[in-house]
């Protein structure tokens, strides 16, 4: 089975649900804790959750490039293992068992698997409150693809890879030693998307997301992608702090299965 690596920062309440989602398909979870200052209380929150961090690092707020460096560093501790790289608000879903996908990759010389975001939101485009007891599937019954058309954010993700395979900032592409990356629809080391394209169900959109998006926008740093966050914040504000579920570009649909995530449930995944 693969390992899992994730980085958790100021938003910890999705983390228990995320770890629960992966627990039966991974060998071990490696949790890195991102402290934003020396008096950041996140370590106490992680302790309350019963999680032992693999690594703790302190960095200025919203440095997504540093987060990616941490992912690459931790994966290198077991370079020949397979790893799932998942942010703490992402629940990845594969079209077949992960062990079968890894076997296919080993047999054909593929070194990484890719996918894309599905944005999960509440009824009528709202941003629900999440606690440890929340049933994510029923609380976020809508899935769509709105962040890219809304603000131009890259929707691609590298989800499963060998430990030595580095990823670019945001985990959007595989990064190679010659300075190139896996941008494009095909790469000889990439499992073809016709065989596997991972759904990354993004539960970013909870009751705290507007405040968090505003903070990143106000950070005004290139490494935070603050310009994109400002566009996103303004678009959400314009729609009364909800997602416009009637916007056809956002491809918002009701998920039929509300006890788990069914890969074939979302009708526009093609």
Predicted ranges, named:
Residues 7-9:
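N-terminal catalytic cores of NTP/NDP-binding nucleotidyl/phosphoryl-transfer enzymes
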Residues 11-25:
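Short, well-formed alpha-helical segments that are part of the catalytic scaffolds
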Residues 64-69, 94-270:
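Catalytic-site signature of metal-activated, phosphate-bearing donor transferases
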């Amino acid at each position: 089975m693969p390992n899992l690596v994730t980085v958790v920062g100021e938003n910890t309440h999705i983390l228990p649900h995320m770890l629960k989602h992966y627990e039966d398909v991974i060998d071990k979870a490696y949790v890195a804790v991102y402290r934003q200052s020396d008096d950041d209380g996140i370590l106490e929150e992680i302790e309350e959750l019963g999680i032992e961090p693999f690594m703790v690092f302190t960095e200025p707020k919203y440095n997504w490039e540093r987060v990616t460096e941490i992912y690459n560093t931790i994966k290198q501790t077991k370079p020949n293992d397979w790893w799932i790289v998942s942010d703490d608000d992402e629940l990845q879903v594969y079209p077949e068992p992960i062990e079968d996908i890894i076997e296919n990759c080993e047999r054909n010389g593929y070194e990484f698997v890719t996918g894309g975001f599905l944005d999960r939101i509440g009824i009528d485009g709202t941003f629900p409150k999440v606690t440890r007891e929340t049933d994510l599937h029923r609380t976020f019954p809508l899935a769509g693809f709105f962040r890219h058309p809304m603000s131009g954010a890259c929707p691609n993700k590298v989800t499963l890879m060998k430990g030595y395979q580095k990823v670019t900032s945001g985990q959007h592409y595989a990064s190679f030693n010659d300075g190139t990356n896996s941008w494009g629809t095909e790469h000889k080391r990439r499992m073809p998307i016709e065989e596997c394209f991972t759904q990354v169900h993004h539960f970013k959109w909870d009751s705290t997301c507007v405040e968090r998006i505003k903070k990143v926008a106000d950070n005004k740093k290139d490494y935070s992608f603050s310009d994109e966050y400002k566009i996103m914040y303004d678009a959400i504000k314009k729609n009364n702090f909800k997602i416009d579920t009637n916007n056809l570009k956002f491809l918002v649909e009701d998920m039929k299965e509300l006890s788990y995530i069914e890969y074939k449930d979302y009708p526009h995944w093609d």
